[in-house]
Amino acid sequence: MSHNSQIQKIQAREIIDSRGNPTVEVDVTLMDGSFGRAAVPSGASTGEYEAVELRDGDKQRYLGKGVLKAVEHVNVKIQEILKGQDALDQNRVDQLMLDADGTKNKGKLGANAILGTSLAVAKAAAFHSKLPLYRYIGGNFARELPVPMMNIINGGAHADNNVDFQEFMILPVGAKNFREGLRMGAEVFHSLKSVLKGKKLNTAVGDEGGFAPDLTSNVEAIEVILQAIEKAGYKPEKDVLLGLDAASSEFYDKSKKKYVLGAENNKEFSSAELVDYYANLVSKYPIITIEDGLDENDWEGWKLLSEKLGKKIQLVGDDLFVTNIEKLSKGITSGVGNSILIKVNQIGSLSETLASIEMAKKAKYTNVVSHRSGETEDVTISHIAVATNAGQIKTGSLSRTDRIAKYNELLRIEEELGKSAVYKGKETFYNL
């Protein structure tokens, strides 16, 4: 180990995220002055098996959501453990923090403290190596730009409207490159705004920059998006595919063991009936991906869904897998889902995130790298998506700087990669 790449100083602070809530930011400085900074995101609809975000619980500050304890853990305990360690040895750095925490869910030091440090160390190491982060993590083979899943209509927990599913997304698969895909998405976003205005519907945007109009049903949300795609001059299916994030744990009634769809007149569905409901949507509309179609504990339902649609469309586990190796391997063995959503703060360290991506790839599951509803200007996930050739990224709509920052970083990466950059479009769903 060269003395130069040793960690000299770690400094954390409390900053504000895109929802006005506090979050953790960490700065790491190495002996040679190399510097890395990372800010941690936070979710609205959280899986019950996620790593724990440490919040202060002091109602006098930020309604109990302060993160001064997590900040102190970084500045004192984590700094003590990591000072003098080699920043180039990411696995060791992360393992030292995990050992010091000692819990299964990072509840002692806080996943926000550990993750902020983990990402900042990687950034400082990349700076030291004179490499962009995607190249430092992914080596010379990192060159695939992800197909963006753009969340242009919000419902569920992300919006105050009558739509059950949390996200309705567009995927610009007909584009030649990322830059063109981003433009297509932006044009559809703008034409959706005018379609909604024409129907005298609200065009204010939600947490992730999508519209949250008060539509009468889930199907109506799909229909207005199809209108917007055509109005923008594109063809559904050929140019743009659709994706849903049902976030069904949010409308699952545990006591009745039923799924209650408010937008469908509070109709109750069994797991099998909900699977049929999805199959019907997929047969009618150009839907290529459904995330969290069933509750995170409804493994039987997930099995049904996978048997029925697993060869046709991408079935993404988010709350189901929570970016966790144990959960994912259970899914792989049970033949459940065929894709995993990757959220760095669900697992809470860079090396564990990369291990989950690796395991998914080996099992021929696709990877979707994702933001959270509470974001910052941090663009690490853009680099992780390219570093791992994940093929897909989910980072919100075409408005709000907390979302756009990620897209703009991908534009810069694509430009830097030049002719070696790859954008796979429909081919990204290689396992269907």
Swiss-Prot record:
UniProt catalytic activity: (2R)-2-phosphoglycerate = phosphoenolpyruvate + H2O
Residues noted as binding (2R)-2-phosphoglycerate in the record, renumbered to the chain: 166, 343, 372-373, 394
Swiss-Prot/TrEMBL keywords: Cytoplasm, Glycolysis, Lyase, Magnesium, Metal-binding, Secreted
Lineage: superkingdom: Bacteria
Cofactor dependence: Mg(2+)
GO BP field: glycolytic process
Job of this protein: Catalyzes the reversible conversion of 2-phosphoglycerate (2-PG) into phosphoenolpyruvate (PEP). It is essential for the degradation of carbohydrates via glycolysis.
Protein name in the entry: Enolase
Organism: Leptospira borgpetersenii serovar Hardjo-bovis (strain JB197)
